[in-house]
Amino acid sequence: GGETGNDAKAMWFGPRL
């Protein structure tokens, strides 16, 4: 998930990162 396509970061920082 997230704009970066990085689910590992999206789960912590949210879809904006």
Swiss-Prot record:
TM region positions: none
Localization: Secreted
Leucine amide carried by residues: L17
Keywords tagged on the record: Amidation, Neuropeptide, Secreted
GO biological process, one term: neuropeptide signaling pathway
Domain of life of the source: Eukaryota
Gene Ontology terms: cellular component: extracellular region
InterPro entries listed in its UniProt record: Pyrokinin_CS
GO molecular function list: neuropeptide hormone activity
Family per similarity comment: Belongs to the pyrokinin family.
Summary of the function given for this chain in its UniProt record: Myoactive.
Protein's name in the database: Pyrokinin-5
